[in-house]
Amino acid sequence: MELPDSPPPLDAPSPPHFLDAPQDRWNVFYPAVQTLVNALGGYEEVESPPDSGIFETVYRPGDSVLGVLKDLKKLWRKDDEDDERTVARCMYRAELMKELVAIVVECAERGEWGRKVALVACDLIAALTWPIDVAQELKEIEDEGPVVTDYASLLRAQLEYKALFLKTTKPLKSILSLMVPCLAKPRKDEKDSRIISLGLHVVRNLLAIKDAVAEGTATGEKEEFAHLQSDLITQLDSLTYLQLFLTLASCADKTDLNPFNVIVLDILHLIFRGIKPSELVQDQKRVPIDSLAKLLEKEKKQKALNSRVGSTRHSRFGTTITVKTAEQRVVLHRQTAIIENPGKILDMTKRKKAVVAKRMDDLTVFVNLSSDAMVILQSFSKAFLEICYNTFIESILRDIRMERTKIRPSDNIRVFYLSSFFIEYLLLLRHKLLQKGGSRRLEELPLGLVAQIAEMDSVKWLFARLRICWDDKPKAWTELQACIECFTQILLLIDDMSTSTNEEDVEVAEILQHQLYYNYDILDSALAVVREYKNQSIAYLDSIIHFAYVLLRMLEKYSKTKAFMFIRKRKNTHKKRKERQAASQANADREQRKIPEEYGDEGEEAFAPDEDAPSYAEHAFTFQSFEKRFAQEAVVNTLLTYLERFLEFDGPEPMKRVVGLMHRQVIKAHAEGLYFKVSTLIIFRRILDKQHVLPAAPSSRDLITLITYILRKFFKHVEKEPFTLVEALSSKSRGKWKTVGGGSDDDDDEMAGQRGRIKEKMGPVELQFIKKHKFSWSQQMSIAFAIIWGDGHGYLIKWIVEVLEQVLAAKQEIVLTTDGGINGDEDEEDEDGNARVRRFGRPSDEAISKFTQFDLQPEESEQITAVTSNPHFRLMLKLLSFDLPPPPMELDFEEDVSSEELALAREKSDSAWFLPANVLPSDIEASIGALKQYMEEPPTLDDDPKKLLRRKARATRRRRRSPSVESYDSETGEVRPGHQHKKNPRQKRAKKAVETQNYKSAAFIEDSDDEDPEATRRFFENEERLRREMDELAAQGGHPMMERGVKRKRGKKNGKGAISDTPPPSQRGNDRET
């Protein structure tokens, strides 16, 4: 806002609501502020020493300076409800800060009265320089309507306050003199703590004021305001403020100094905010030379870009080229049209689509410190690492966990930022020492200097904050970026520990990696943050790319050292939600019965498990399957957004990270189809056109090679499937990029779309080998392998080999822990005292009893499709000893189920493959060896392998007609004979045998506890009658059973029929040959 040149007269009439408009508030407050400022004191010329004729300007406080300062504090409180901060603007116009600084310098050492005046002045200085969060201020007044507030003038005023404060070292020296007596006391009361806190807050406020951004040719005031932070750091060092900060940080665990750890955290964050550790670790004498080299390299790159355009303002040679097409004629007036593609030149003349500018960084600010300030910070950073980092961070984390009132939400960001800064700084220092003096000099800076943030409790808290920021609505992007950067540096620290020469560091790194990777949520977060990137800042984009690159690289390195890995994964909440709904329905039914409250069990509800708490289960883990999860279009979009800024990359490292992640998708996950899009091809063309300006680094060459590979794959696919050009215009959903060539011939089934429903109704096709060929197991496996390999499904074979290797490793582990070796020679005895006998190469019975069933759990859509509907792959699974559970029937369910639910259950059972527990490790090892041998040397067959198979006949399911209501006897539960359906004799015999067996069993079970003597008598009479009948039939049939229990072969009459038409009751239902 524009301030008036002179205030109106004090006796001017006030409007009715004079405090409603900012101009009216100015007219009221400015005269009062100006009067009070004039009453504070003034400057006068004093001869010093007396009679010397030399005069100096000295500030003389007024007689009532203390009361005036208190009146100014009362006026300051008027701004609490004023969005315009009118009183603050009045104090700036009245030059109050100049008076306050002079009072502090003059009165700080004038005894008790002078200290009191100086402290009140410091209180006003802290209020005037308090940081203004413009974003938060605008957010608060957002709902109040169109309020226009000039925050730029307020920020400019604070910048001038900072410059005024730093003109000499006397103000900071006076503030330190106020704090030192309080710091020296062994027992500090509340007043001492408030004085120390006030002095630290003044320093914090000065550090928080950002420097002005000035051009390199700026002079005068602009140049002065651009280097205030450097001057402040220099004064803080010369006045021993930095040593004071080190003392407070190292004693943060002490009771008397712990209250100041949060303000020290804020000060340290402001000191290092915007400074890159890579810049701080450099030799400051060479910084100007390196900066000049970067500028020359940037200029060279820009010239190379301009030379390709080739357009000059004044040229000696004029060029005009005519391009004729079938319908039009285009004239080009460019010299580059001689050698360039005319279509590309025409594209350059098209109107460019405006690109939305993205924020560079929300976490840090731009700073340009001088070389002297950087040298001071180098020594200060190293001293902070060696003396107090672990103690200081531990005290902060303890206060955060205990939820102290002094902890603010923004303190989490400061902890993350400082931790990531000092970890990266330590790693860079160690790398520099390693280059200079070898590994022996690394002992000067051990990794334990930053061990506190790498503790498992700290890492868990860090990940918990990451999840909270991610789940917030809207997401806390700034804290999330700080979390990700800190997590990345912790991973790099663990990686450095794993390669250390210190055995203790290696052991700790092994434990930390195991605990980190066991929690699958941490691994899943890397995929989530990369997938969900939209329009956040460029620094956030760089952070998530770096995080994903480091995590995948370390996880791959760790998985190679382990035969098998397990993870703790959160269960699917869909099933749990259904169970909760069923439980709520049961509770509702229970409520309908109206059970009195006094009979309810209150303790049961108190100790009931939390329904909202997540449940977890342990799963086998393979890096290949996790790596394939990164083959998603959302991840590709994030990588391409990062790659688009290839001309802005600062060094080869960013290019190396994005190329590494793209290589995992294209080469290792075989997902090059994700890049078959028009927008992606345009980016690739831009990179190929400007590859001459890429840095001369291996990562640049890898990028060009990868792009060439993707383009070659794309055009080969276009030759095979021209419809790919149409698919390149659409997005690639999950699994769609595998079939980017378009629809298949099965889309038109010539059956009005009924073929798919019929196939779905019939279930998956089952195959079997033609029996007349009598193939061995190895021959059957070679045939199945040849079919799958020939269809281009080799990735399925690689996947099943990995699964078998996991199962084999798990079973071998059980054998080793149980038997202590396969062919031990020691004599062992079992529980009965008998010697344990073990054959060579076979586990003991005890080890076999510990084997568990392994459930095959496909993760990718292609794997799920293969185990469900690929008949050749299902045949291979059977050859590898995998099995399927029997299809569920209606009797398997406790409650009645609908036909749709029964069909869904049967569909799930068709894909629930499992490896039985009784499969021995030797059999699995043989299967793995056969598959690997075929993968190295695929088998060659003379005949078509598909002709050696045939469809397996399905067992027909017969339905039994339900009896009608009239034919059902409600008393006996039987069907009346008159209403029974006619059956052939074979069905009658089978049914009668089943009925007889059921009758005998039912009579025994139901009457076992019956005390009715009449029922007992009838039961034994029935048994005696059945026994006589059996004896008679046996005598007529000629003793069909031999003494050894083997069934006697029946003779034939006239080549057909059996000797006896009616088998004995003992064999009814078992004779299926007649």
Swiss-Prot record:
GO terms for cellular component: replication fork protection complex. Keywords: Cell cycle, DNA damage, DNA repair, DNA replication inhibitor, Meiosis, Nucleus. Residues 948-962, 978-991, 1046-1055 have a biased composition (Basic residues). The keyword DNA repair applies. InterPro entries: Timeless, Timeless_N. Residues 1014-1031 have a biased composition (Basic and acidic residues). The keyword Transport does not apply. Involved in chromosome segregation during meiosis and DNA damage repair. Belongs to the timeless family. This is Topoisomerase 1-associated factor 1.
